[in-house]
Amino acid sequence: SSDSTGYFELACEVPCTLEFSHVNYKKESYTLKDTRSPFIVILRNKFNNLREVVVTGRSTPGRLYSSKEGIEMIPAILGEQDILKYLATTPGIITTNALDPGIYVRGSNSCENGFLTHDMEIASPDHLTGILSTFDPFILNNSTVYKSGFPAVYNSYLSSYINMRPDPGNKQKYEGEITLGLVSSALKIKGPLVRDHTSFAASFRTSYLQTIARLYNKSVKDQKQQNFMPEYAFNDATVSIDSKLSNRWRVTAFGLFTIDGLSMKLNENVNYDFNWHTFSGNAGAWYTPANGDILHFRLGVKSAFSEGDAEGTIPMGGGNRNYSIIARIMYTHSFLDKFQWNIGGKFEQARFETANRPDAEENILI
């Protein structure tokens, strides 16, 4: 043991042998015969000769996977689980705050991420105000995220691609759940349409923020004051169908529909209304010949509609609508158990429309 000044005290019967050692120094032994005589111990440097060291490393692939188990491990924001919140916990992906559903991959913008289901792009990943994403993990809980090294079949986005695989449902029995959150509630169910053959999974979510806001606005005594609460409501429905026609054929379908509405009353004479609707749907089939090759073709559609109206001293309004039709076909052949080649094609037609509100000549487009 040592005292407060760092001096060691050792107890032993004389004569005794003391050993002194330290990292990078040679061990020294000293035989103590007389405790009254001081002595000095000098440790000599020890040289460790190492053989050549080769350090190797492999580049980390810019691809990761998400699962239902991983999503359930993160805290629920406003009582809702979210696949994008889970992705924000992985390396290279962040979000600005807990109420922002967007993700930022390696410093890029959130609008530079492509969201797909079965390799088909969807209309919009989040609701109007950005509180929550449109993805319900009850159905959309497995995905492949490409942060770099994008496959050649993807284009148009710079940061990442999130390809989600909808839950096929349960072909044996029915199961479901009802969730109650701080801002919304949902009814979820999955089960067989044809037992052992065709299954489905469906989720319907609605908010009650607008009800709280309406009750508050009715309680405002002075309707001329600008202290009204915005009345915001969102709804979404997600449906997935999976059917195994035979050992060679498999058919799937997916649909996602959202409705958002925001009403802001500044005073008794001025009111703003915004509406936002989106729809994404696709259906496709896989054919697997006896040699293990895969033929996959898919048809999809996506659309988004927004409309705004302002009632007051200067009424104005407008809206826009865009939609796309996409068709894809791909053939995959594997050989030597390690290599595969893909060949395919893609067709897409898109249209964007915008217009003023037709009932007033002085309206300006917003």
Where are these regions (language model features)?
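Periplasmic N-terminal accessory/gating domains of Gram-negative outer-membrane beta-barrel systems
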Residues: 26, 37-39, 59-150, 161, ...
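Predominantly transmembrane beta-strands of Gram-negative outer membrane beta-barrel pores used
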Residues: 114, 142-153, 159-167, 174-222, ...
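Outer-membrane beta-barrel domain signature
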Residues: 74, 130, 174-176, 225-230, ...
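Outer-membrane beta-barrel architecture
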Residues: 85, 104, 161-163, 177, ...
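Face-selective signature of the C-terminal outer-membrane beta-barrel domain
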Residues: 242-260, 275-366
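Periplasm-facing N-terminal accessory domains of Gram-negative outer-membrane beta-barrel systems
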Residues: 1-52, 95
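Structural signature of outer-membrane beta-barrel domains
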Residues: 60, 110, 120-122, 167, ...
